[in-house]
């Protein structure tokens, strides 16, 4: 892959309007309380891709597309076990989701909505859980779209 071809997309991302819209801790808190659902949503989509494109099972069978297998597994590895540092500065491994929750706690954002949602997912399943009123509307819309992709 020619990495220079990504420069326009990188510039576009670096100049995204979101970076001019968040001007205070209060605005960051609101953003994070919404965005955490997208962080979780991405993992759900990624795990679906892993399940469909990099099937796991026993007995193991070779996958003819090694590049795709590596690409998906590298993303999963980073998302599920990225480097983090504990309060003593020691290296630990944890998910991006957990790193995000830790950052939310650091700025004073509430994790109640996402934690309640995930508890409902575990106890009642995704379809009942996503009717939770505490999910911000834009997050609900994103998750509905992702679940449609996952189920089809």
What name fits each language-model region?
Residues 1-13, 23-61, 74, 78-83:
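Alpha-helical bundle segments that constitute or directly flank the non-heme di-iron/ferroxidase center
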Residues 70, 74-152:
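Active-site-proximal alpha-helical scaffolds that flank and shape metal-associated catalytic sites
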């Amino acid at each position: 892959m020619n990495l220079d071809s990504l420069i326009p997309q990188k510039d576009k991302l670096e100049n995204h309007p979101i970076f001019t819209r968040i001007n205070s801790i209060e605005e960051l808190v609101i953003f994070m309380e919404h965005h955490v659902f997208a962080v979780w949503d991405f993992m759900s989509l990624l795990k679906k891709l892993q399940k469909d494109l990099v099937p796991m099972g026993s007995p193991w069978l070779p996958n003819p597309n090694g590049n795709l297998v590596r690409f998906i597994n590298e993303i999963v590895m980073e998302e599920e076990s990225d480097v983090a540092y504990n309060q003593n500065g020691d290296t630990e491994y944890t998910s991006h989701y957990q790193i995000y929750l830790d950052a939310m706690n650091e700025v004073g954002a509430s994790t109640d909505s996402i934690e309640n949602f995930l508890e409902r997912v575990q106890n009642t399943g995704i379809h009942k859980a996503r009717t939770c009123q505490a999910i911000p509307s834009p997050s609900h819309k994103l998750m509905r779209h992702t679940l449609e992709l996952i189920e089809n």
